[in-house]
Amino acid sequence: MTWLLNWREVAVLDANAEALGVKVSDLMAAAGKALAHKAATMAPEGEILILCGPGNNGGDGFVAALELIEFGGTVRLIASHKSQKGEVAQSFRTKCPSVEVWKEGCDFGTPSLLIDCLLGVGLKGAPRGNIAKMIDWVKPNNPPLVLACDIPSGLGSKKFLAADATVTFHAEKQDMLYIDVGEVTVAPLPWPPETVNCGPGDALCYPPLDPSAHKGERGRVLIVGGGPYHGAPILAGRAAARIGCDLIHVAMPRNAVDRATWPDHLIPERLFDEDHLGERARDEIFKLLDEKSFDAVLIGPGLGRLEETTNMAREIIEKLSELEIPTVIDADAIYALDEGVWPKGLTGVATPHAQELRMWAWDEEPSNILAAEDIPSESRVIIRTGSVDQLTGLEGRYCECIGGHPRMATGGTGDLLAGAVAGLLAQGMTPWSASRLACYVMRVAGMMTANEFGPGLLASDVPPHIARALSNITAD
């Protein structure tokens, strides 16, 4: 894996590794030993002062201390709190011969090296409490060398501890573009290769439920499709609802609206065009976009490929780029895209199967289609759907989603995936995180559905299991 990880992705991949059978103690041991090895090369003589925070970053520090002591080093340990938050970190702490708890006025001493294990990449915002006080305590003492564990504490805020060197794990982190990280060493972790693929850890990015939330605050989606195939937008809408989105509007030609069987939770938008969407529908959809605050739009399911319809889809996609509304481009709407080009300014996800991707990309790699403007690294994704979903994002992001059941290779399941992605985008997830979680949840839901229905599985059987699969891996 080559992309720069953010703090959410680190937690996701740690959880995926644990689900694959990797013990937290093994991860901590590997991190601490790598840290100790670097420390020994930086300060072969003299005392090494290790500052440990209350989390797993502190646990890495305790492992490093044990390793250094075993090989004859002189180590002084100071913890920010009386105990660690996690059992594994606490178990390593109790193995250390002596751990001081920091208090104001504590003597700094004359260490040859300070190891910063106060905070890892999981911190959001500036350091607080004892951690902030310890950083203020360190700075005037001006230690000769500082080695950071994973990332310098407080990096990116006004209160941080600059490092001469940093040992980070598995891959560099986004904040490491700062000069204050010093020389960076990337140490491996005992993660199986599939750790980076979609997995249960992706549920950590699912937006938590606000107890005071009102109707509509979990997202509003517009689905544009239908015409020759009225069932596809309905399936997409059902998936968006079952993945937690509040309000789902489905815009179709009036004859398609009249033919469809409408679930109670979907809101029909009956467009004037009778059988397929064209210029008049474009104007109606523009009006909808102006009148209602949609958090995400899905265009394509069941749309058809008439020239008038394709032209309409192209203009709507351009409008969505202007409005900066996250968008999922699926099925027939992919034929509205210019060859080998991502729509300028658009944030979102495209979900082509192999044939659609060949038509759109020709000889271009998906990563080349995405690359262009200066935008956040999680803003664009191409999901090549199939027996193995292949997800390509910006700046080297790539992963796969495996598993599920082969009976999910049936008509309508692609519409479900597109709807699930749109539902997550509407709830505020980034295109990259939404794509990963939607792909994983669909695989789990597909397995549940296949176990219930066997050879008779239909795409319409899947949506209730989307909710069950999501519930199994989230805290809600």
Predicted regions and their residues:
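Small-residue (G/A/S/T)-rich helix-start motifs and N-terminal tracts that mark the onset
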Residues: 1-82, 90, 165, 176-331, ...
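Tryptophan-centered motif/residue detector
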Residues: 96, 137, 437-440
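Internal gly/pro-rich beta-alpha loop/helix module
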Residues: 111-113, 118-198
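Short amphipathic alpha-helical segment within the helicase RecA-like ATPase core
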Residues: 77, 87, 118
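Hydrophobic beta-strand residues in large extracellular and virion-surface proteins
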Residues: 75-77, 99, 169
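Short acidic low-complexity segments
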Residues: 98-110, 287-288
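A generic structural signal for ordered secondary structure
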Residues: 95, 106-109, 145, 222, ...
